Amino acid sequence: MKILKSNPFLALANNYMIDAPEPSNISYFWNFGSLLACVLVIQIVIGILLACFYIPNMDLAFLSVERIVRDVNYGFLLRAFHANGASFFFIFLYLHIGRGLYYGSYKYPRTMTWNIGVIIFLLTIITAFLGYCLPANQMSFWGATVITNLLSAVPFIGDDLVHLLWGGFSVSNPTLNRFFSLHYLMPFVIAALSVMHLIALHTNGSSNPLGVTANMDRIPMNPYYLIKDLITIFIFLIGINYMAFYNPYGFMEPDCALPADPLKTPMSIVPEWYLLPFYAILRAIPNFQLGVIAMLLSILVLLLLPLLDFSAIRGNSFNPFGKFFFWTFVADFVILAWIGGSHPENVFITIGAIATIFYFSYFFILIPVYTILGNTLIDLNLSSIKR
């Protein structure tokens, strides 16, 4: 134990992972941070191995992925773990964000931690999209064409930005080279931001379900929460092994098994399942520029939460209005994901528009209103007690 505190590097790890004081009442909802760190390390290691065999060329990219699966030793496992690892990463990311929303982790003094987390979320979406485009299959080719065209919504220079990103007049070899380089780089940027996220968290410590400062009742990270984290990590490893061995392509569209054909459009162009809610918001607004703005705002609105929540109490544990509207918001998010994966027919367009309106209403109307109402009820109760 002496070397853990005398060695500067081990002392740093000791302060963050062993002797770190944590609230004694945090539940398994606080395990998603360690799960995300575990998945990120796995994704980086497997991604480096896959990059050794991938060829960023429109004619050879699809064949190189097929060669990885068929000819490279355990290549089929590498691809299955990497593809399904992305899905697990987003599952844990959404649960992590949802826990932060419910328990008010964005409120002072953890605002900086929250803001860094939102930036990580945005970069993760970009990284996932870049990786989705790399196999150059039918769905990823047309997905890349559609999503990169969103840059044309930028006034005056939009078309030039699209051509700059493409490296030509369509998705081609320069595009894949750019996407491959950025997809290789971004996980390391995310890892660096994750360290910043951890440093910011360590400054004030973790929150807890009660939403109160727990400096008087803390226990060390090791062995209590370290063992608890290992339990969920083992459960995750069981889950990803099941997906990799028994259902490796369960999250993929059938068109992902076809090579890219620039002359034939798929029946329905959809992104991966974890981006469907934002795709639904994009499609719900008829105006192209407003749709792009709404899609970006649906992510960046998370940065505004510390300014929109006026509650004197952190979190929704003791807020019945907050509980009701939070779970309604979760249902709305699931509906948006369903609409994003459906064909843009009249009934789905209408449902998507209603779900989009509620999505933004939750942040800009409902949260300010019910937090102010909650404060008013607390003040009235306190004033009646004083009398």
Swiss-Prot record:
Textual note on the cofactor = Binds 2 heme b groups non-covalently.
**Where exactly are the transmembrane stretches of this chain?**
32-52, 76-98, 113-133, 179-199, 225-245, 289-309, 321-341, 348-368
The UniProt annotation places heme b b566 binding at: H96, H197
The positions annotated for binding heme b b562 are: H82, H183
Can you say where in the cell this protein is located? Mitochondrion inner membrane
Membrane topology, from the record: Multi-pass membrane protein
Any Gene Ontology biological process: mitochondrial electron transport, ubiquinol to cytochrome c
Q: Name the positions where a ubiquinone binds.
A: H202
Ordered alphabetically, the record's keywords are:
Electron transport, Heme, Iron, Membrane, Metal-binding, Mitochondrion, Mitochondrion inner membrane, Respiratory chain, Transmembrane, Transmembrane helix, Transport, Ubiquinone
- Assembly description: Fungal cytochrome b-c1 complex contains 10 subunits; 3 respiratory subunits, 2 core proteins and 5 low-molecular weight proteins. Cytochrome b-c1 complex is a homodimer.
Q: Which family does it belong to?
A: Belongs to the cytochrome b family.
Could you tell me which PANTHER family the record lists for this protein? CYTOCHROME B
Q: What does this protein do?
A: Component of the ubiquinol-cytochrome c reductase complex (complex III or cytochrome b-c1 complex) that is part of the mitochondrial respiratory chain. The b-c1 complex mediates electron transfer from ubiquinol to cytochrome c. Contributes to the generation of a proton gradient across the mitochondrial membrane that is then used for ATP synthesis.
What is this protein's name?
Answer: Cytochrome b
The protein's organism comes out as Schizosaccharomyces pombe (strain 972 / ATCC 24843) (Fission yeast)
Lineage of the organism: Eukaryota, Fungi, Dikarya, Ascomycota, Taphrinomycotina
